[in-house]
Amino acid sequence: MTHCCSPCCQPTCCRTTCWQPTTVTTCSSTPCCQPSCCVSSCCQPCCHPTCCQNTCCRTTCCQPICVTSCCQPSCCSTPCCQPTCCGSSCGQSSSCAPVYCRRTCYHPTSVCLPGCLNQSCGSNCCQPCCRPACCETTCCRTTCFQPTCVYSCCQPSCC
Protein backbone atom coordinates (compact mmCIF):
# COMPACT_ATOMS: atom_id res chain seq x y z
CA MET A 1 0.00 0.00 0.00
CA THR A 2 1.24 3.47 -0.79
CA HIS A 3 1.49 6.26 1.71
CA CYS A 4 1.21 9.97 1.25
CA CYS A 5 4.35 11.99 1.39
CA SER A 6 5.04 13.13 4.94
CA PRO A 7 8.21 14.07 6.81
CA CYS A 8 9.05 10.39 7.15
CA CYS A 9 9.66 9.04 3.69
CA GLN A 10 12.58 7.42 1.97
CA PRO A 11 15.03 10.04 0.64
CA THR A 12 14.81 8.80 -2.91
CA CYS A 13 11.07 8.88 -3.25
CA CYS A 14 9.71 11.87 -1.42
CA ARG A 15 10.00 15.53 -0.66
CA THR A 16 9.71 16.55 2.99
CA THR A 17 8.05 19.87 2.27
CA CYS A 18 5.68 19.12 -0.56
CA TRP A 19 3.29 21.79 -1.72
CA GLN A 20 1.30 18.85 -2.99
CA PRO A 21 2.02 15.49 -1.33
CA THR A 22 3.90 12.89 -3.32
CA THR A 23 2.89 9.26 -3.14
CA VAL A 24 5.60 6.90 -2.00
CA THR A 25 5.74 3.19 -1.30
CA THR A 26 8.01 3.18 1.72
CA CYS A 27 8.43 5.40 4.75
CA SER A 28 10.86 5.61 7.60
CA SER A 29 10.84 7.34 10.96
CA THR A 30 13.07 10.29 10.12
CA PRO A 31 12.80 13.28 7.79
CA CYS A 32 14.24 12.70 4.38
CA CYS A 33 14.14 14.02 0.88
CA GLN A 34 17.73 14.73 0.09
CA PRO A 35 18.88 16.65 -3.01
CA SER A 36 19.38 13.34 -4.81
CA CYS A 37 15.62 13.37 -5.20
CA CYS A 38 15.98 16.13 -7.76
CA VAL A 39 14.93 14.30 -10.90
CA SER A 40 12.07 15.07 -13.24
CA SER A 41 9.81 12.58 -11.52
CA CYS A 42 10.52 14.22 -8.19
CA CYS A 43 10.27 17.86 -9.08
CA GLN A 44 6.56 18.19 -9.56
CA PRO A 45 4.81 21.53 -9.91
CA CYS A 46 5.21 23.75 -6.89
CA CYS A 47 4.54 27.38 -6.28
CA HIS A 48 6.46 28.24 -3.16
CA PRO A 49 10.24 28.26 -2.59
CA THR A 50 9.89 25.81 0.27
CA CYS A 51 7.73 23.22 -1.41
CA CYS A 52 10.47 21.36 -3.24
CA GLN A 53 14.11 20.52 -2.94
CA ASN A 54 16.03 23.76 -2.94
CA THR A 55 17.85 22.41 -5.98
CA CYS A 56 14.58 22.28 -7.86
CA CYS A 57 12.66 25.38 -6.87
CA ARG A 58 13.58 28.83 -7.97
CA THR A 59 14.02 31.03 -4.92
CA THR A 60 15.44 34.24 -6.35
CA CYS A 61 12.16 35.87 -7.31
CA CYS A 62 9.93 38.27 -5.46
CA GLN A 63 6.91 36.04 -5.89
CA PRO A 64 6.76 32.24 -5.89
CA ILE A 65 6.54 30.66 -9.31
CA CYS A 66 5.74 27.13 -10.37
CA VAL A 67 8.33 24.77 -11.76
CA THR A 68 7.73 21.42 -13.38
CA SER A 69 11.28 20.12 -13.47
CA CYS A 70 14.72 20.93 -12.11
CA CYS A 71 16.23 24.26 -12.91
CA GLN A 72 13.98 25.96 -15.40
CA PRO A 73 16.01 27.65 -18.14
CA SER A 74 14.61 31.10 -17.43
CA CYS A 75 14.33 32.96 -14.18
CA CYS A 76 10.77 34.12 -13.90
CA SER A 77 8.12 36.39 -15.27
CA THR A 78 8.40 40.16 -15.38
CA PRO A 79 6.48 40.84 -12.14
CA CYS A 80 8.52 38.22 -10.37
CA CYS A 81 12.09 39.20 -10.96
CA GLN A 82 14.12 41.11 -8.49
CA PRO A 83 16.19 43.89 -10.07
CA THR A 84 19.43 41.97 -9.60
CA CYS A 85 18.06 38.55 -10.36
CA CYS A 86 17.58 38.16 -14.06
CA GLY A 87 18.27 39.25 -17.56
CA SER A 88 16.19 40.53 -20.43
CA SER A 89 14.14 37.35 -20.63
CA CYS A 90 12.70 38.27 -17.26
CA GLY A 91 11.80 41.78 -18.27
CA GLN A 92 14.71 43.34 -16.47
CA SER A 93 17.33 45.74 -17.70
CA SER A 94 21.00 45.21 -18.46
CA SER A 95 21.76 46.14 -14.87
CA CYS A 96 20.85 42.62 -13.84
CA ALA A 97 23.53 40.65 -12.06
CA PRO A 98 25.76 38.73 -14.50
CA VAL A 99 26.16 35.78 -12.15
CA TYR A 100 22.58 34.57 -12.07
CA CYS A 101 23.08 31.02 -13.26
CA ARG A 102 21.30 27.73 -13.24
CA ARG A 103 21.10 25.98 -9.87
CA THR A 104 22.36 22.49 -9.18
CA CYS A 105 20.32 19.74 -10.81
CA TYR A 106 20.49 16.00 -10.86
CA HIS A 107 21.82 16.33 -14.38
CA PRO A 108 23.21 19.84 -14.12
CA THR A 109 25.00 22.11 -16.48
CA SER A 110 27.00 25.17 -15.63
CA VAL A 111 25.66 27.42 -18.34
CA CYS A 112 24.45 30.93 -17.92
CA LEU A 113 20.82 31.85 -17.98
CA PRO A 114 19.66 34.70 -20.20
CA GLY A 115 21.15 37.88 -18.80
CA CYS A 116 24.35 36.28 -17.60
CA LEU A 117 27.64 37.35 -19.04
CA ASN A 118 29.46 34.63 -20.93
CA GLN A 119 32.40 34.73 -18.56
CA SER A 120 30.08 34.00 -15.64
CA CYS A 121 29.87 30.36 -16.58
CA GLY A 122 33.25 29.40 -17.87
CA SER A 123 35.46 26.57 -16.75
CA ASN A 124 36.42 28.49 -13.63
CA CYS A 125 32.83 29.13 -12.69
CA CYS A 126 31.90 26.04 -10.77
CA GLN A 127 33.69 26.13 -7.46
CA PRO A 128 32.86 24.36 -4.19
CA CYS A 129 30.46 26.09 -1.86
CA CYS A 130 28.66 24.57 1.05
CA ARG A 131 26.76 27.19 2.97
CA PRO A 132 24.11 29.46 1.52
CA ALA A 133 25.09 32.16 4.02
CA CYS A 134 28.45 32.70 2.38
CA CYS A 135 27.49 33.18 -1.24
CA GLU A 136 24.90 34.18 -3.75
CA THR A 137 21.89 31.90 -3.35
CA THR A 138 22.09 30.99 -7.03
CA CYS A 139 25.72 29.99 -6.73
CA CYS A 140 26.08 28.11 -3.48
CA ARG A 141 25.64 24.40 -2.89
CA THR A 142 23.83 23.79 0.35
CA THR A 143 24.44 20.11 1.04
CA CYS A 144 28.15 19.90 1.79
CA PHE A 145 30.03 19.63 5.03
CA GLN A 146 32.64 22.36 4.71
CA PRO A 147 31.76 25.86 3.50
CA THR A 148 33.55 27.49 0.60
CA CYS A 149 32.32 30.67 -1.02
CA VAL A 150 31.83 31.18 -4.71
CA TYR A 151 30.72 34.22 -6.64
CA SER A 152 29.48 32.82 -9.89
CA CYS A 153 27.75 29.66 -11.06
CA CYS A 154 26.74 26.50 -9.30
CA GLN A 155 28.72 23.30 -9.44
CA PRO A 156 27.37 20.13 -11.07
CA SER A 157 27.52 18.10 -7.88
CA CYS A 158 27.52 18.77 -4.18
CA CYS A 159 30.75 17.38 -2.85
Curated annotation (Swiss-Prot):
Family to which the UniProt record says this protein belongs: Belongs to the KRTAP type 9 family.
GO MF annotation: an example: identical protein binding
Function summary: In the hair cortex, hair keratin intermediate filaments are embedded in an interfilamentous matrix, consisting of hair keratin-associated proteins (KRTAP), which are essential for the formation of a rigid and resistant hair shaft through their extensive disulfide bond cross-linking with abundant cysteine residues of hair keratins. The matrix proteins include the high-sulfur and high-glycine-tyrosine keratins.
Sequence repeat spans: 8-12, 13-17, 32-36, 37-41, 46-50, 51-55, 56-60, 61-65, 70-74, 75-79, 80-84, 85-89, 129-133, 134-138, 139-143, 153-157
The organism's place on the tree of life at top rank: Eukaryota
Complexes and interactors: Interacts with hair keratins.
InterPro entries: KAP
Alphabetical UniProt keywords: Keratin, Repeat
Transmembrane residue ranges: none
Protein name: Keratin-associated protein 9-3
Gene Ontology terms: cellular component: cytosol; keratin filament
Protein's organism: Homo sapiens (Human)
Region 16 X 5 AA repeats of C-C-[RQVSHE]-[SPTN]-[TASPI]: start-end pairs: 8-157
Annotated gene: KRTAP9-3
